[in-house]
A protein has these predicted regions:
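NTP-dependent small-molecule kinase module
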Residues: 18-21, 101, 105-107, 177-180, ...
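Hydrophobic anchor at the beta1->P-loop junction of P-loop NTPases
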Residues: 30
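P-loop (Walker A) phosphate-binding loop of NTP-binding proteins
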Residues: 33
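Conserved lysine of the Walker
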Residues: 38
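Hydrophobic positions on the alpha1 helix immediately C-terminal to the Walker A/P-loop
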Residues: 41
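N-terminal phosphate/diphosphate-binding loop that engages ATP/GTP or pyrophosphate donors
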Residues: 47-112
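Small-molecule kinase domains that catalyze NTP-dependent phosphoryl transfer to phosphate-bearing small molecules
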Residues: 91-93, 136, 140-144, 155-160, ...
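ATP-dependent NMP and nucleoside kinases share a basic, alpha-helical "lid"
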Residues: 107-185
């Protein structure tokens, strides 16, 4: 069965009056390395603006989880072969992103240490990326045409997936701050998480398929000494400025 990524976007629709001077829907790209706080900030920004939220990283993590499970029964299966065996769905509603594989809720499972260690390898496979990127672009076009803004977070949204996005951010922080945030999520020691993050950074920035990089026209935000609320305010202000032009 060919893998079909289905993204359901429900919840309150945004309107021009819902966030001040907003006069048109926008595509917002939020890129950055692992542990920079992209997911937290994206969720808060989506709630603040009423925009739809597409967690692209969750899609790749879902493929990774499925691949790791497949290998338990089929040790020699390739990543591409695994991808086409499963139906992945990602839905957004009231600030929560739910991820399912063949109907099973794997929202928590995809944040495991094992998935984190393997996701760079899986997301670098051309067949996997082609499936995900095709859906991301199509979904954004549909939402914008309906008058609703869209927020996408990932590592190459502004540079590869949506190079024409009108608002682009690159969120970063020093490794120790990122490790502390991720450690709170996983319960791991910070020293252990730093090693994983540094390995992930190297893999993401040097891979052949769409490596991690800042888009030339992206606004870089260093969140090392900023709270999530402060980052959201900076982004929200920029969105209002662009939307009112």
């Amino acid at each position: 069965m060919r893998c079909v990524l289905m993204v359901g976007l429900s919840g309150r629709q945004s309107s021009p009056t819902s966030i001040g001077n907003m006069t048109r829907a926008l595509a917002v790209a939020i890129d950055g390395p692992a542990g920079a706080g992209k997911s937290t900030v994206s969720r808060a920004l989506a709630l603040k603006t009423g925009f739809a939220l597409l967690d692209t990283g969750a899609m790749y993590r879902a493929y990774t989880w499925a691949y790791l499970k497949d290998r338990e029964s089929y040790p020699h299966i390739s990543i591409a072969e695994s991808a086409i065996r499963h139906e992945i769905s990602v839905t957004f509603d009231d600030g929560s992103t739910l991820v399912r594989c063949d109907g099973r809720d794997i929202t928590r499972d995809i944040r495991s240490v094992e998935v984190t260690a393997a996701v760079s390898e899986v997301s670098a496979v051309a067949e996997v990326r082609d499936l995900a990127v095709e859906l991301q672009r199509r979904t954004v076009a549909t939402e914008l045409s309906s008058g609703r803004g869209v927020i996408l977070e990932g590592r190459d949204i502004g540079s590869t997936v949506l190079p024409n996005a009108e608002v682009k951010f690159f969120l970063t922080a020093d490794p120790s701050a990122r490790a502390a945030r991720r450690g709170l999520e996983t319960g791991q020691e910070v020293s252990e998480v730093i090693e994983l993050i540094q390995a992930r950074d190297l893999a993401d920035s040097t891979r052949e398929q769409s490596p991690l990089r800042k888009a030339e026209d992206a606004i870089e935000i260093d969140a090392t000494h900023l709270s999530a609320d402060e980052v959201v305010e900076v982004m929200h202000s920029r969105i209002l400025d662009v939307a009112s032009l």
